[in-house]
Amino acid sequence: MSSLAVRDPAMDRSLRSVFVGNIPYEATEEQLKDIFSEVGSVVSFRLVYDRETGKPKGYGFCEYQDQETALSAMRNLNGREFSGRALRVDNAASEKNKEELKSLGPAAPIIDSPYGDPIDPEDAPESITRAVASLPPEQMFELMKQMKLCVQNSHQEARNMLLQNPQLAYALLQAQVVMRIMDPEIALKILHRKIHVTPLIPGKSQPVSGPGPGGPGPSGPGGPGPGPAPGLCPGPNVMLNQQNPPAPQPQHLPRRPVKDIPPLMQTSIQGGIPAPGPIPAAVPGPGPGSLTPGGAMQPQVGMPVVGPVPLERGQMQISDPRPPMPRGPMPSGGIPPRGLLGDAPNDPRGGTLLSVTGEVEPRGYMGPPHQGPPMHHGHDNRGPASHDMRGGPLAADPRMLIGEPRGPMIDQRGLPMDGRGGRESRGMETRPMETEVLEPRGMERRMETCAMETRGMDARGLEMRGPGPSSRGPMTGGIQGPGPINMGAGGPQGPRQVPNIAGVGNPGGTMQGAGIQGGGMQGAGMQGGGMQGAGMQGGGMQGAGMQAGMQGASMQGGMQGAGMQGASKQGGGQPSSFSPGQSQVTPQDQEKAALIMQVLQLTADQIAMLPPEQRQSILILKEQIQKSTGAS
């Protein structure tokens, strides 16, 4: 007894008492006391009565002086027959007898645990999972809604509730997984994190954070499992409860590796809860429409680029989605429908849009990646161009230079490339690099075959320029005009329709557009033909050299102004060829002539550094100029 005296009074009493069940309703405490005193001295015997009716419930408790006597009573009196009933004698500390013993004094009411039957902590996770899974969807939703309101309205109270009832927190977490509110993997991470932290707080915290929006405070869903605590030992029970969700999972993992939390989560997952992984953002638009560094969407190749100039080409959408190669942003406005150098399937440049993207029309993209060292050295002379080449030294990626000039695009050509409008980005734009530059037909074989056919540079070639200079004045029309520079047709290019050029025969070789567009000097000097805006920039001299050389429409105006050596050649060689507007040399023509001269001044080494097509285009250009000069 002395050893027992130090124990908790309630615990000591439970150990010295026995539970007596199946007692006849007519039996009295005195009769029962006499029977149980057979094994030892009985301190007290109490029958339990219904509080409302006052009738006996059919069971009671017998308290002995020591635990040994109580154990003897359980061994000897269990099954003892009394008034036709076999008495059931058991340990008073088991099951709900604990609650009864606590209030053993005066008419203590029987207290049923609100958590349900006690459960081994090791089985708590599975029990909670089953409880949550058994809830109808409507009830689960209602519980989660209530819990959300509870958290929003009484944050601290909700937190304390979950901390004190970890089984509830775990149930809410499980419910979120079942309802697909939370990814099972995230739930598992939360549980493991809890484990690593202090079991109580982490476990609670985790559910709190996760379940915040979750299930109702009611212990219903998961409460039953882990929460048998209210019994005699509230302190220990609480600890167990708190640890239950986390403890079983981490602590029992060795014993029940799968059963623990992971299994629960797995079960919920099996239930069909798809792990809510982040939804990958849809790829914006078709490949061609990738965002350029500026953030603007690059027009898709297939789309008519004409409208979207918003995208500053100057930005040089090097990030063409398709080809890794940096291409200038496709000019939104005047991309030739197709005839870019890059278009040609056999275009050796490989950087051409077509070769890179394949299905994408070259015009969709400004130009193939610059090839060869930028030979822009000649640009500067071009006049206003020094800065316009995208503001960067021409040395920069030729494409960038040419294409970039998003600004007024004062293309070095001196023409406000911006104005080019038609030429738009193409001429100087990043597009210059665009295959359009050496539109297949321009610099391509056609260019070779008859691209710069004598006629191309011929009086007619210059002639086309006649209308060209004026119309192309702004370069907008001249270079490819707002409309696509249809190099292929060789017909009059948009605004700059040069009937003669169109007639010039080789559609590819004609000087359509501003220069030898068809011939390879389309737009701004072989723009379409091969010196796209930047003078072969895209296809021909994509490098800065040709860019500057052909860019400003150097080939275009150059052929006219320079090729024919200003107005003198023009009038002398084929006065009739020039259109009426051509009779007088405009500043633009002079600038073009200067650009052409720059291209012609490229050294053999510089020309050798260019891609084959570009090299050939320049050679053809020189040859045509020589012929034109000789003819004049």
Swiss-Prot record:
It holds the Pfam family RRM_1. The keyword Nucleus applies. Residues 508-565 are annotated as: 12 X 5 AA tandem repeats of G-[AT]-G-[MI]-Q. It is found in: Nucleus. Residues 428-466 are annotated as: 8 X 5 AA tandem repeats of M-E-T-R-[AG]. One of its GO terms (cellular component) is nucleoplasm. Signal peptide: none annotated. Expressed in testes, where it is restricted to pachytene spermatocytes and spermatids, and in the brain (at protein level). It comes from the Eukaryota. Residues 377-390, 420-433 have a biased composition (Basic and acidic residues). Residues 213-233, 275-287 have a biased composition (Pro residues). Its main location: nucleus. Sequence repeats lie at residues 428-432, 433-437, 438-442, 443-446, 447-451, 452-456, 457-461, 462-466, 508-512, 513-517, 518-522, 523-527, 528-532, 533-537, 538-542, 543-547, 548-551, 552-556, 557-560, 561-565. Residues 201-296, 365-433, 519-590 are annotated as: Disordered. Keywords: mRNA processing, Nucleus, Phosphoprotein, Repeat, RNA-binding. Residues 16-94 form the RRM domain. One of its GO terms (molecular function) is RNA binding. PROSITE patterns: RRM. Residues 519-543, 558-574 have a biased composition (Gly residues). GO terms for biological process: mRNA 3'-end processing. Residues 234-244, 365-375, 544-557, 575-584 have a biased composition (Low complexity). The modification Phosphoserine is found at S579. SMART domains: RRM (SM00360). May play a significant role in AAUAAA-independent mRNA polyadenylation in germ cells. Directly involved in the binding to pre-mRNAs. This is Cleavage stimulation factor subunit 2 tau variant. The lineage of its organism: Eukaryota, Metazoa, Chordata, Craniata, Vertebrata.
